[in-house]
Amino acid sequence: MVRTFHLCTITGIPLKAHLSFGLTLLFVAYVVHLHNLTVAASVGFVLLVLVMFVCVILHEFGHSMAARRYSIETLDIIISHIGGLARLQDVPEEPQKEIVVALAGPTVNVAIATIVGCYLHSVSYTHLTLPTKA
């Protein structure tokens, strides 16, 4: 695609950012400026957005790895302001294989949610409790 910038290549798959991804960066800068966030809050917000896009990229790699299992090449993965797209060379002809490729991305999301949920369940939140009247 003409409006993309190559970021890196992972497992032989080019990862690209669409020009519209710049809108996300502008949005982050706007929110930080608009709300006069502290440095800590600004860093936290930027990290939240980055983690979200890492999850999007992992989701797309889920589709790509499932397609690779059926010898279907992934041309590239493109991230934009609204999400990601794994561009596959072809679509599996057998419905069962197509379902596996289609469900691989959401399966990655479930795995991420499970890992994060287990971690959050294991940590203490006593420092986040509201003060109570004595």
Which residues does each predicted region cover?
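Membrane-interfacial alpha-helical segments at the cytosolic side of multi-pass membrane proteins
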Residues: 26-32, 70, 112-120
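Short, hydrophobic transmembrane alpha-helix segments
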Residues: 30-42
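Conserved small/polar residues in nucleotide/adenosyl-binding loops
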Residues: 126-132
